[in-house]
Amino acid sequence: MARLVNCIKLGREAEGLDFPPYPGALGKRIWEEVSKQAWADWMKQQTMLVNENRLNLADARARQYLARQMEKHFFGDGADAVQGYVPPTPPGA
């Protein structure tokens, strides 16, 4: 049976992650309070941040920036908007 969490991002109960996705206290908090769906949404946001800002993940400053954005995304006022990103128009719109 899937582990359920009260997802802080979705505002409802949803399937939880299988393991903490990040080390330390932040990873434990994400594991306890974030659903698989919300984590997948963050992974898409993180990918856009890396690509649009041309972040080099070998650079410690880039990794620290992403960690701050992840914390803001889940537990703060939201991650930085991706500059230049225009969401796709839904079909028939």
Swiss-Prot record:
The keyword Signal does not apply. GO terms for cellular component: cytosol. One of its GO terms (molecular function) is iron ion binding. Keywords: Iron. One of its GO terms (biological process) is cellular response to oxidative stress. InterPro entries: Fe_traffick_prot_YggX (IPR007457), Fe_traffick_prot_YggX_sf (IPR036766). Belongs to the Fe(2+)-trafficking protein family. Could be a mediator in iron transactions between iron acquisition and iron-requiring processes, such as synthesis and/or repair of Fe-S clusters in biosynthetic enzymes. NCBIfam families: PRK05408.1. This is Probable Fe(2+)-trafficking protein. It comes from Polaromonas naphthalenivorans (strain CJ2). The lineage of its organism: Bacteria, Pseudomonadati, Pseudomonadota, Betaproteobacteria, Burkholderiales.
